[in-house]
Each structure stands twice: as C-alpha cells, then as structure tokens.
UniProtKB/Swiss-Prot annotation:
Pfam families on file: HTH_WhiA (PF02650), LAGLIDADG_WhiA (PF14527), WhiA_N (PF10298)
Origin organism lineage: Bacteria, Bacillati, Actinomycetota, Actinomycetes, Kitasatosporales
Superkingdom per UniProt: Bacteria
UniProt-recorded name of the protein: Probable cell division protein WhiA
Family statement: Belongs to the WhiA family.
Any coiled-coil regions, as ranges: none
HAMAP family xrefs: HTH_type_WhiA
Molecular function as annotated in GO: DNA binding
Function description: Involved in cell division and chromosome segregation. Involved in sporulation. May coordinate the cessation of aerial hyphae growth and subsequent chromosome segregation and/or septation. Required for expression of the ParB partioning protein during sporogenesis. Activates its own transcription and represses WhiB. Binds with low affinity to its own promoter and to the Parp2 sporulation-specific promoter. Also binds directly to the RNA polymerase sigma factor WhiG, leading to inhibition of WhiG-dependent transcription in a dose-dependent manner.
Length: 328
C-alpha cells in the first residue's frame, strides 16, 4: 500500500506556508544529502515517485525561491524502479540554512530544524508527510503490519518520534542492522496517522483490508475450534465403544438387558452422538438416559474386573483414547 499512500499525499493541496516549509525540510532531511562542490553546498534529494519529486521541486521554488533540476534515474543494478533526484546547485547553501539542514555557521543539523520540532500540530503532520514521502513504507494489515520510516540517523528518528507524540501517535525508534527506523505498529494508530497525513482514501482501503483480515482470522479460529471439538467427540465415542466391548466381555451374560442394549447401541454406532443413540433406542431415550446406562455398565464391569483381578474396561484403549476417556 506504500505506493498508494505516497501517490495520495503527494497530491494533497497544502496552503499554509509553515506546513509547506516543514514538509520540504523533512523531505530534504530524510531523502536528501549535502555535497560540497567547489566550496559550495549542493543539495540532492532522491525520491521513488515522480509526483513527490515534482511536488518538492515546486515547493522549493514557490516557498524558498530556488530553482532546481529534476533528474530521472532509470532502473538498473539494485534499483528495481525509477528514482527521481531533485538537485539544487545555485543557492544550495542558502536553502540548506532556510530548511534547517545547517545552522547559521554552516554546521550540519542532524535532527529536524527547531521551527519544525517546536512548531504547531500542523507542522508535525507536515514533517511526517515529508518523511513518509522520502523514506516511508506501509505493509498490509496483519500480524506484522507496520508503518515505518527509514531515518538518516538517530537524531532524526527521535525528532520524528517526538512529532508523532504531539499527534498522540505511539511510535518507536529502532535500529535494525545499523539502520535507524521509526515504526508504528498498532493498527488504530496507523489509521490515525494516515488520516493526519491526509491519506483519506488510503485509510479507507487500509481499514477495509484490516477488517476483512480480522473477519477471516476469526472464521479460521472458529473453524479450527469446531474441527478440534468434532475430532475430540469422535475419539471419545470410539473410546466409549471400545470400553463397552470390553465391559460386555467381562460381564458376559450377567448384565441387565437395558444396560446391555445401551452398550450394543454404542458399539454398533461408534461415531454417533449420545443424542443420536437415544433416538435409535427402542423405545427412544434421552441422551442423559443413554449416558447413565453406559456409565452404569462400565462401572459394573470395572468392579467385576477388580474382584476377578483382571484388566478393566480401559484395556482396549490406546494413549489418545485414554486421554479422551469419556462416554461420548
């Protein structure tokens, strides 16, 4: 969904000058680099979408008054898609100071500029919008869903976490294989942040996919639960049939007919539920009556086996059936 979000927010109209400044500052901080060429500062920002690059080029001119060139780099090598480089040569040193890339003495600033860090809520939103356009990604809703931004260093990461905090968004700075990242994992927080960025269509798509996944996961859990219960019930019925068979062997002819009849039903219909066994009885019985008769049959046989010193009704059961040693 990354491309959809970037496409949407790169076309978002922003009228407040402070917000446009904050967004440009963030894009240059997270996607840019400073180079010294013949003693002068040259600024470059490399982006992965043409819309974001054109937006940056326009704002640099309209807000800061500097011209820039847009260079398209075709896919090749490790680059899977085209890359778009916005380069400012004339006035690069002035733009670097205006956007907070360097301080008044020309020393690099590693985080976000003070006017963004201490600005209004809209500036925090704009900073996040710029950072996401520069190096953001959004994964599909799921167990490992996340919205994250790759940062040029820990100072920029902490500044972005602070901006998220001002928006009441829980974000964490992490270093993964030597790369600083800011990550938002909570599904509700991701939806709230996308709304703050102005990606309203993307929020709807995100929430729809998230809901669909949750419904599917719930259905799978219920299906697994039902399957497990069915398997457990089937094993229990088979185990009960094996115990009844052993009980009738132990008691031989010395067993009341109504108990023997219930036992024979269990043996003849090993997969049937107690309710189904009751319906098959003549006359029909309730499931509690069937269960009671089978319990009494087993108890009588186990007592006789104990008196005779022989194996009881559990003798015919395997390990799994012993674990499910129920009537049915």
């Amino acid at each position: 969904m990354t491309a959809a979000v970037k496409s949407e927010i790169s076309q978002l109209p922003v009228t407040r000058t402070c917000c446009r400044k904050a967004e440009v500052s963030a894009v240059l901080r997270f996607a840019g680099g400073l180079h010294l060429v013949s003693g002068r500062i040259v600024i470059e920002a490399e982006l992965d979408t043409g819309n974001a690059a054109r937006r940056l080029k326009r704002d640099i001119l309209e807000i800061f008054g500097h011209s820039s060139e847009l260079i398209v780099m075709a896919p090749g090598g490790l680059r899977r898609g085209s890359r778009f480089v916005v380069r400012v040569v004339a006035g690069g040193d002035q733009l670097a100071r205006q956007t907070g890339l360097v301080d008044g003495r020309g020393r690099p600033i590693r985080g976000l500029p003070p006017q963004v860090v201490s600005g209004a809520t809209c500036d925090a939103e704009a900073a996040w919008r710029g950072a996401f356009l520069a190096h953001g990604s959004l994964t599909e809703p799921g167990r490992s869903s996340s919205l994250e931004v790759t940062c040029p260093g820990p100072e920029a990461a902490l500044a972005l976490v602070g901006a998220a905090r001002r928006l009441s968004i829980p974000a964490k700075a992490r270093e993964v294989r030597g790369v600083d990242r800011v990550v938002v994992r909570d599904g509700d927080a991701i939806g709230a942040l996308l709304t703050r960025l102005g990606a309203h269509d993307s929020v709807l798509a995100w929430e729809e996919r998230r809901l669909r996944r949750e419904v599917r996961a719930t259905a799978n859990r219920l299906a697994n639960f039902d399957d497990a219960n069915l398997r457990r019930s089937a094993r229990a019925a088979v185990a009960a049939g094996a115990r009844v068979q052993r009980a009738l062997e132990i008691l031989a002819d010395d067993v009341p007919e109504h108990l023997a009849a219930a036992g024979r039903l269990r043996m003849e219909h090993k997969q049937a539920s107690l309710e189904e066994l009751g319906a098959l009885a003549d006359p029909p019985l309730t499931k509690d009556a069937v269960a009671g008769r089978i319990r009494r049959l087993l108890a009588m046989a186990d007592k006789r086996a104990s008196d005779l010193g022989i194996a009881g009704t559990d003798a015919n059961l395997g390990e799994e059936e012993l674990a499910d040693n129920l009537v049915g």
